Regions:
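C-terminal lobe/tail of nucleotide-utilizing enzymes
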Residues: 1-31, 36-37, 194-237
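P-loop/Walker-type NTP enzyme "switch/lid" segment
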Residues: 6-31, 35, 42-46, 54-58, ...
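Primarily NTPase-proximal linker/entry elements flanking Walker-type ATP/GTP-binding cores
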Residues: 38-49, 70-74
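Hydrophobic positions on the alpha1 helix immediately C-terminal to the Walker A/P-loop
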Residues: 63-64, 68
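Conserved nucleotide-binding/hydrolysis micro-motifs of P-loop NTPases
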Residues: 86-88, 112, 131-134, 166-167, ...
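Inter-motif core of Ras-like GTPase G domains
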Residues: 151-154, 168-189
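Hydrophobic residues in beta-strands of the RecA-like P-loop NTPase core, especially within AAA+ ATPase
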Residues: 160-161, 215
Length: 237
């Protein structure tokens, strides 16, 4: 593994731009991502479960997951956003929600999961990570997690799952067999090519469907008003 990924609560304040806080160009970029995601599953019955991950930390995956979920809900889809990064949860801090009870508490059988409704949009529900467990990979790859996602498919058009970085811990690979696809976030001037290639290799070895890539944090110098800070690239076979 190329990057250490420690368990622990992040002591940070909300600083990401979310939903209506985004610039026009950023909103359009997420709308384009939303459209491409819909094309990735044209004939699938039931709700789609899509993971958002990266090769390494600090690529912007959590912010992308939140804004993708927002964009999908804004287009009149019923959407559930799940923070499944149990080691370094981010969604609760970004959206100023209580961390627990959340996903880990439900999977461990301690409490019912708390679904946050209407925080951003009426059609967007949010489940936070819950308390940091001693065994995240076991919980996230469990039969109980599969059953939970199968139930979510019946209630939502899309389930967006914020996942840990692939090369840091085994959690994303453990969950990959239960979801329909993974979008990989690649931050400009941050991710190394070899790490992205290794991420794809590991996901494909786990029989995960890599739907595409989001190239994030592109510099706007010299770019006119049509500049988009996020670009989507569909994976080609």
């Amino acid at each position: 593994m190329s990057t250490k990924y420690y368990s622990g609560i992040r002591n940070k304040k909300k600083n990401a731009k979310i939903g209506e806080e985004l610039s026009f160009a950023s909103k359009e970029a997420y709308n384009l991502l939303r459209t491409n995601i819909s094309f990735a599953f044209p004939d699938q019955a039931g709700g789609r479960v899509l993971g958002v991950s990266s090769a390494c930390p600090q690529e912007g995956k959590s912010t992308t997951a939140i804004n993708l979920a927002y964009s999908l809900a804004d287009a009149d889809n019923k959407v559930l956003l799940i923070d499944a990064d149990m080691r370094r949860p981010s969604v609760c801090f970004t959206l100023e929600l209580e961390m627990s009870p959340g996903l880990s508490n439900m999977l461990a059988g301690n409490k019912d999961v708390n679904i946050n409704k209407g925080k951003l949009l009426e059609k967007l529900d949010i489940i936070t990570s819950g308390d940091i467990p001693p065994n995240p990979s076991e919980l996230i790859g469990s039969q109980k997690m599969k059953d939970f996602l199968d139930d979510c498919r019946k209630k939502y058009d899309y389930v967006i799952v914020d996942l840990p970085p692939v090369l840091s811990v085994a959690d994303t690979l453990a969950l990959s067999k239960y979801i329909d696809g993974v979008v990989i976030i690649v931050r400009h001037n941050n991710a190394k090519r070899r790490d992205v290639v290794e991420t794809i290799r590991q996901l494909e070895f786990a029989n995960a469907k890599v739907v595409g890539f989001v190239y994030n944090k592109i510099e706007s110098k010299g770019v006119a008003r049509y500049y988009k800070p996020t670009k989507y690239y569909k994976k080609t076979q």
